């Protein structure tokens, strides 16, 4: 907090915790945030409730420990205001459901996420993200972001995205 002195921090944290705030998502190897646009609730271009989906995702995955931090983005239309394709997990609303993008990231080596599935229902999206995160947590190297992990899957399987679709949708490994 801007202007706070070091000796004030224990008191400040105590007050925040007492008020119901949590700590950890800003620096842990876990979900950092779910960025959302206004979606159909407040935007004339929105075709799905991106804000509601973002809240659902954040509540479901917050605190989940993983090899590295991961970020989500949820855009309510193809204008992509939440920059979903640049996130580890990105959703872009369509009139028929959600397009799910996986393996994006920003930073020094930015990468667009890859289109995993089109026009999926909200229930299917949750199922695919559950499976994706489980598989990532179980197979990625420590401190490996999802974009680099997907590149490693490309090297190992020829097409990392096709491999993920086989594992997560078709359950080719019998783990889902």
PLM segments and residue spans:
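A glycine-rich phosphate-binding loop feature that marks nucleotide/adenosyl-phosphate handling sites
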Residues: 33-34, 74-79, 147-161
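Generic structural signal for well-ordered, non-membrane alpha-helical segments
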Residues: 5, 9, 46-50, 54, ...
